[in-house]
């Protein structure tokens, strides 16, 4: 049996892999998307399904106003003492000299249960992780952020003991590893294996130069000796490898005594207009999760098949377990809660944003702020998980002025998105409008207004993603579809396009309603269809 990479498709970065008995879990970053943290489950490392979003309450994660690519960075999931432990960072400032961020701990006895209220740990840097040593002691590690002009901002990896009894950090933090010449040392995970403590970190930045570095020491506080063939994982030297950006990793030992590495990766597309500065391409699906097998030599881990990472990997000697899909091809909103694959921006889906019961078998969204807001958006979306898919919805919406709009959106962040929306024109009544936001530059390229007939109840909207391009379609009866012949570029919904690669999420598609007049007019969505080709 083979593991086929990536195992978690679409925006699922910074994997923290964990074993509890014979069950395996991967927690990934969600940044500004709510609920916070995605946890996937597997029995065999081959087949995975989404099972939990542990940060469900504003008391656990308050992101209103957080910047693009702020929010939850690099969670660390572990299992010890009969319960799950989750460390996460909430990043409040991403630009400038300072990186204002706060590290928290929540726990739960079951992976999909009601997670505890958070314990605030520190704010000295991001990518925090919790290490449970064999002697019962626990330690927090994180990268240290240094804002000083004459210093490198990545100041090394710090460690500090955590007292579970007192529910706080004790003692003094200590820098135990300053990194290698690759710089940008982050994402620490510590393991006590045999005679050594192994410190796994990410280096080189989370673009194409990304890498996983490992060092070891006989003492937890160091000094740490770097792997003789470091980095143990990177695709920087192999631009033709289908898995790029390989780095930010974590290690698991299976119950069959085999070793694996879960890591971040990206699968670029190469549009015809690629410049020399983007010869590595663009990754609209965001940073995904892959798994490699490890072997040991001279008490050092190595990646089977080469440090660049492989698409196919030998699976562990565990019987296969296949799960049902976590989303239907067509979601007709029959449940009282949103499907687990849907998320909202920064804030939870509450009665303020919408309802699944006020209009039975509909998702009702109340108009709020625009797609450029970082506060209150009525936007329910899911990840692009393929570069070949269709997404479709039907919306009943009766706007009364031009400030009210509802429809289908493809979104990266507040500065990069496209939307096909029902809105209002003073002379024509209900119309369809295509709006493009390209690095915060706006356009509405339809030369001829698309007027919606008065008798039409539902307006049907569809998007077809065709790898490096995508197109919108509309219908007034679900049978006769009209293509809007404007090719939109998938690359513009990628980390690599946004300000030259300074952001960290991926493309989403979903349903949105805005009302900047402040009247909160509702839009009713009859279904949402997502079908990969």
Swiss-Prot record:
The active site is at 14 (proton acceptor), 186 (proton donor). GO terms for cellular component: plasma membrane. Induction: Up-regulated by xylose. Subject to carbon catabolite repression (CCR). Its EC number is 3.2.1.37. SUPFAM superfamilies: Arabinanase/levansucrase/invertase, Concanavalin A-like lectins/glucanases. It catalyses: Hydrolysis of (1->4)-beta-D-xylans, to remove successive D-xylose residues from the non-reducing termini. GO terms for biological process: xylan catabolic process. It is found in: Cell membrane. InterPro entries: ConA-like_dom_sf, GH43_C2, Glyco_hydro_43, Glyco_hydro_beta-prop_sf, Glycosyl_Hydrlase_43. This is Beta-xylosidase. The record marks 127 as: Important for catalytic activity, responsible for pKa modulation of the active site Glu and correct orientation of both the proton donor and substrate. Keywords: Carbohydrate metabolism, Cell membrane, Glycosidase, Hydrolase, Membrane, Polysaccharide degradation, Xylan degradation. It is an enzyme of class 3 (hydrolase). Its main location: membrane. PANTHER family: BETA-XYLOSIDASE, BETA-XYLOSIDASE-RELATED. One of its GO terms (molecular function) is xylan 1,4-beta-xylosidase activity.
